[in-house]
Amino acid sequence: MASSVVIMLRDKTNYADLTGLARLRAMVRTLGLHVIHPVVKVADGTYLAGSRSIDTEGEFLQAEVAFGAMRWHKVDPQKVVTGVEVKNPDLAKVDEVGFVDLSPGGGHGISGAFNLSALELYAKPVAR
């Protein structure tokens, strides 16, 4: 069975403040028609996907995401589908951060997928 996928990481001792100059950097490769979007889980447990997308056309490339001036949409973490737009979410206390591929894969083989490595978050720590 092929489905959408979310990959997220968290710091056990701190939230991340993604306001200001915060950045998410990763080495990524997208294949087929797949693109990935930044995704966060804010302190109240809400999952949000950002409007910026990354498409590398099969090449391994370093990608960097700035969180400012991005549109955010609610994500159902069980179904990995987007919902309504969330205006001005509070990104000062983010519990988890990562990427989401909202397109289901093609099943066996690599009809469409993404690879992710070397994930780096540049943000201010906020004590839990």
PLM features per residue range, with description:
Residues M1-G83, K93:
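Extracellular ligand-binding interfaces
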Residues A26, G68-L119:
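Extracellular beta-strand ligand-recognition surfaces/modules
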Residues I36, T46-L48, V94-D95, L102, ...:
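Aromatic-residue detector
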Residues L121-V126:
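Charged interaction scaffolds used for protein-protein
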